[in-house]
């Protein structure tokens, strides 16, 4: 933590991961029955589009993002991220663990460039006691329709930011609370499962 949309609120990268890029578009999916969708489609339709696979009930909101100056971006090596995962696991997670055999795991998706696979495999074997599991994907500049993160240039960022700055969240009235708290139950009541 913070991860997902929580990291957007706090202005941080998502979890242990680096920022996606210096400039990028972050996409969020919302139900067409949600108050924010109604507001944006009426007032800022340039920020909203139908979700490609579920256009009847889901929309995608696109928001420009800029990493802080000097921030680590996803161009870092897989070994650099793995070392950060190990350090946080040793110094923070296991260092703060109080009782029981099971400790939490640092959730991470490691994207591996073609020339990194052998050394990453070796590192993972040699350091297997420092993680419970890792997601591993090939690094790719390939994008798919409405990807959660997509690189953009400064001009695109600036153009989208103009629209975003005019969004007035005070004008959104939520008559029904459609919040699904199931994802937060694991750490409810001050104790994580």
What are these regions (language model features)?
Residues 2, 9-179:
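Catalytic alpha/beta core of large soluble enzyme barrels
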